[in-house]
Amino acid sequence: CSHGVRPATQTVSLTQSPQDTILVIKLTPNHQKVSTTMEYEHITHSFEPIYNEDSEILILGTLPSVKSRENNFYYGHKQNRFWKLLAKLCEEETPQTVEEKTAMLLRHRIAIWDVIQSCDIKGSSDSSIKNVTPTDLKQILDHCQIRQIYANGNKAGALYKKYQQPLTGREILVLPSTSPANAAWSLERLYEKWSVIH
């Protein structure tokens, strides 16, 4: 990454970035603008799906975010509402550990995975995803009585419809994303839409 620092009051002239970079402007505590470029990375999914033979609901995301990869588990960003929302739907306390999260999913017959096995992506930006290799959902669908598949967000839904639906023949119901990038949706609004799963 390249870094350039100028006083906040100074006019900054930006040239167009190359196709595979995105320019991010941040305001630092001392009121200086820092411009950084974020390049594409090739990411391979490193988590196993969470399910067992009793799973009836499958929730699919896109790909683990940077924070999720750092924490080595699904929906690891502190501002992602997934675990808080799911706990509310299941009438349980919000789980904190990987073991608690996994146990809650399996208790309520919920399976989770993602639609992307590998891709090129800038940071955690779903809109930048390209060169997708999809996950093989057969390992779940062939071993569970999944009655409904849900997408956590529009991007996951679109990718499923493009890559997996022609193979599975199964429809997907797209739910609003729990990502912090979808901050316009409050937890209460998400709860109303997501209540269909439980």
Regions found by a protein language model. Name each.
Residues 56-62:
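Short, hydrophobic/glycine-enriched beta-strand segments
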Residues 67-128:
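Short, surface-exposed acidic-centric catalytic microdomains
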Residues 38-56, 78, 125-134, 138, ...:
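C-terminal capping/extension of enzyme domains
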Residues 107-155:
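Internal catalytic-core helix/loop-beta-alpha segment
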Residues 156-160:
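Short, well-ordered alpha-helical microsegments
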Residues 17, 27:
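Cationic, low-complexity basic patches in intrinsically disordered or flexible, solvent-exposed regions
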Residues 5-8, 12, 20, 24, ...:
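Acidic, Ala/Val/Gly-enriched low-complexity intrinsically disordered segments
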